């Protein structure tokens, strides 16, 4: 091809060469995110709180089950009798069965006596540690309406008045509800207002059964022999009447009752309590011929006897460590409508005092009242029955230094407790009157006891379980 015949070809621009593909690099796996471990103190705190809540729920279930049983005690005139109601027996059977479920025969020895006392012992797991006996009572007072008891659980209490189905109000502004101000956000348990609740002393029973369960699940806790007594007829002053020491293998070193009503204090001394009965034997006659027929008006004579006692010795005039004389019952011993001739009236009298000299003065006043009555009513025979020691001051026989030990143990649980004098009696005080060792009384959670306003706080009961556990630990470490 010669150059003359050649044609010019259109030169198209060339597309840029594609960049060579980069060699694929292996993708590195992202390291797994490491979750920081929960600090040990926080984990322990969370576990402790979970356990606390679980125990409180157990306490609520346990107490409300106990409360539905009407275990009111009832008194008998004959001091040799020891009446037990069906409800008291049901209560004893329930606690016995529950304890046998909680522990084995090896680590918890359980017995129920023919008088419906329940005894339990956790054997010592170390040597040289004082033994402790904790006590509560299963019966409730006959001095308030009982029958069908309906406990009501009020969760997350808001601090206001609690309206009960019976139409009554439990208020923090009243004496019965003053402790409610300290229970905001907690669980309150009341009755329906028609009956008592039985917090005195089923709260104590709840605390002790829960304490037993707590101890058996805590293998690190060192302790001496631990005894638990669930008694009967405390509310009629006879809890010691059928107490059987042989169930405990001798006297314990330390005695502690769980039957108090003050969350800030525990009793270290109490009244000496004496019961006296006076019988006025008279005879009926037509009042129109009363002089000639030697009318023996036993009822008026009994009233006259009561009237001879100075008003300043009445309970309404007594406070602090002052004692009192209380003529609390006047009742016929015969059917006055069925018997045309005989009249007999019984006057029951309580003597309460801290000072033995005051007790002696009270006895002299009663003796003088009986003498004056015999002079004023010559046709009525005034008979003074032998007095009965109902309970004794626990301060006389309490374990030395126990008050300081309890204060120390409570402080470890963040609870401030103050020793106080008790204007009443406890199971420990009744045992002291029978020659047993006396001991203090701890708060059990009961409030407004012996009334239809009676109530308790579940968290209070839990707190006292932990205080009791701390007492056991402190005793072992002293």
What is each residue range found by the language model?
Residues 77-129, 133-135, 139, 412, ...:
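A non-catalytic alpha/beta surface segment that caps or lines the substrate-entry region
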Residues 300-320, 324-326, 391-441:
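Active-site-adjacent substrate-binding region
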Residues 181-271, 317-339, 347-354, 476-478:
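Acidic/histidine-rich catalytic neighborhood of metal-dependent amide-processing enzymes
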Residues 128-221, 225, 230, 463:
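Active-site metal-coordination/substrate-binding segment of hydrolases
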Residues 53-86, 189-190, 389, 447-451:
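N-terminal capping segment at the start of a domain
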Residues 268, 290-336, 340, 357-383:
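Acidic-enriched catalytic cores of C-N bond-cleaving enzymes acting on peptides and small amides
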Residues 343, 416-470, 475:
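Zn-dependent metallopeptidase/amidohydrolase metal-coordination segment
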Residues 80-83, 325-335, 347-354, 381-403, ...:
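A short beta-alpha structural unit
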């Amino acid at each position: 091809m010669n150059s003359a015949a050649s044609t010019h070809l259109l030169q198209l621009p060339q597309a840029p060469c594609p960049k060579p593909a980069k060699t694929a690099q292996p993708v590195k796996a992202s390291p797994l995110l490491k979750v920081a471990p929960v600090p040990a103190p926080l984990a322990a705190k969370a576990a402790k709180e979970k356990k606390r809540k679980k125990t409180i729920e157990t306490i609520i279930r346990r107490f409300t089950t106990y409360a539905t049983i009407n275990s009111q005690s009832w008194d008998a005139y004959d001091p040799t009798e020891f009446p037990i109601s069906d409800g008291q027996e049901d209560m004893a059977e329930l606690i016995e069965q529950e304890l046998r479920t909680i522990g084995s025969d090896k680590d918890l020895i359980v017995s129920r006596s023919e008088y419906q006392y329940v005894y339990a012992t956790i054997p010592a797991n170390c040597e040289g540690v004082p033994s402790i006996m904790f006590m509560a009572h299963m019966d409730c007072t006959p001095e308030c309406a009982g029958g069908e008891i309906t406990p009501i659980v009020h969760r997350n209490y808001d601090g206001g008045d609690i309206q009960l189905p019976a139409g009554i109000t439990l208020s923090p502004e009243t004496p019965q509800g003053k402790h409610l101000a300290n229970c905001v956000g907690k669980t309150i348990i009341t009755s329906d207002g028609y009956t008592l609740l039985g917090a005195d002393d089923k709260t104590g029973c709840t605390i002790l059964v829960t304490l037993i369960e707590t101890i058996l699940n805590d293998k690190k806790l060192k302790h001496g022999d631990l005894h638990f007594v669930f008694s009967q007829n405390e509310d009629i002053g006879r809890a010691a009447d059928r107490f059987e020491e042989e169930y405990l293998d001798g006297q314990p070193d330390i005695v502690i009752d769980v039957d108090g009503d003050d969350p800030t204090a525990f009793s270290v001394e109490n009244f000496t309590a004496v019961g006296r009965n006076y019988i006025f034997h008279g005879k009926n006659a037509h009042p129109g011929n009363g002089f000639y027929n030697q009318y023996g008006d036993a009822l008026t004579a009994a009233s006259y006897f009561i009237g001879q006692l100075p008003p300043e010795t009445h309970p309404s005039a007594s406070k602090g460590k002052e004692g009192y004389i209380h003529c609390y019952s006047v009742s016929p011993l015969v059917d006055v409508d069925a018997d045309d001739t005989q009249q007999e009236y019984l006057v029951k009298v309580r003597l309460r005092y801290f000072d033995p000299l005051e007790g002696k003065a009270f006895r002299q006043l009663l003796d003088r009242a009986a003498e004056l009555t015999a002079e004023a009513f010559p046709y009525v025979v005034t008979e003074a029955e032998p007095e009965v020691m109902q309970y004794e001051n626990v301060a006389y026989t309490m374990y030395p230094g126990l008050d300081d030990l309890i204060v120390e143990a409570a402080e470890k649980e963040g609870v401030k407790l103050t020793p106080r004098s008790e204007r009443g009696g406890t199971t420990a005080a009744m045992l002291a009157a029978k020659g047993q060792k006396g001991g203090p009384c701890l708060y059990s959670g009961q409030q407004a006891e012996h009334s239809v306003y009676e109530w308790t706080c579940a968290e209070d009961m839990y707190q006292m379980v932990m205080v009791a556990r701390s007492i056991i630990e402190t005793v072992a470490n002293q």
